[in-house]
Amino acid sequence: MTTIQTIGVVGYDKCSEQDTITALEIFRGAAMVLAGKIAPWKLKTPTSTLDVKLVSLVPGNITMQMGTQVVSDAVVGDSDMFDLLYIPGGVGSGAASLDARMLGLIQRHYKAEKIVASNCSGVGILARAGILGKHPVTCVAAVAPGLREEGINVPQPRRMWLGLPEARLWTTTGSYGVNGSTVAMVAHYFGEEIGTICSMMFDTLGGIGQQIYELQGPEFYFHPDLEEKFAAFFQPMLLPPTGNKK
């Protein structure tokens, strides 16, 4: 099993509150379970330390897409590295997908064989970083058509999450899928016992059941007319054109 001791959730201007904080809270919940601070029974899993940080690319507060101001734990430096790098989505993802600092951070981690995960429109940032190749990914409906036009493999129907451990990639749909996907990541990378406890802490097991132990999440419904309208409205903001259509 891949050893994960550090997780960096990257906050940026106009990232989504749900996409960012939901993942951050679940990872920090897992850290508390791993440390033995939350133990509904005598755990078989040995205690361990998991350091989870909300990091930013620049100093100062992070202003999220609905105006929430948050303080990062650290400004990520050129030599900082995390075993798992997590890129959330949000209306600021389009600008982030053109930010050389963000793209360099993702590329540096993937080149170093670290795990890179993302949700919602943040998957577009991974695409612009050039790390997805032909691997199947999932994302929010609003950027799926644009990613397909750029040659990214977004299967239909979309899955709530797609975990690709061998490729060191884990992608997630929009905000609705973040809870289930993050708990599934915990179950996969830290074991079923830790995943089960987190799934009860965050009520995930009651919502989607045994799927949390799988690498693919539940299928999403397809609403072609609505998805076309939402993509037309949001895509210029979330995935600005670069001229790289395939």
Task: Describe the residue ranges of each PLM region.
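Active-site-adjacent pocket-lining segments in enzyme domains
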Residues: 2-16, 29-36, 48-55, 73-246
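Short N-terminal binding/cap micro-motifs at the start of the first secondary-structure element
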Residues: 15-20, 63
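Histidine-anchored nucleotide/phosphate-binding helix
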Residues: 21-30
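Generic recognition of short, well-ordered alpha-helical segments
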Residues: 21-22, 65, 97-101
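N-terminal beta-loop-helix "entrance" segment that forms/cooperates
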Residues: 36-70
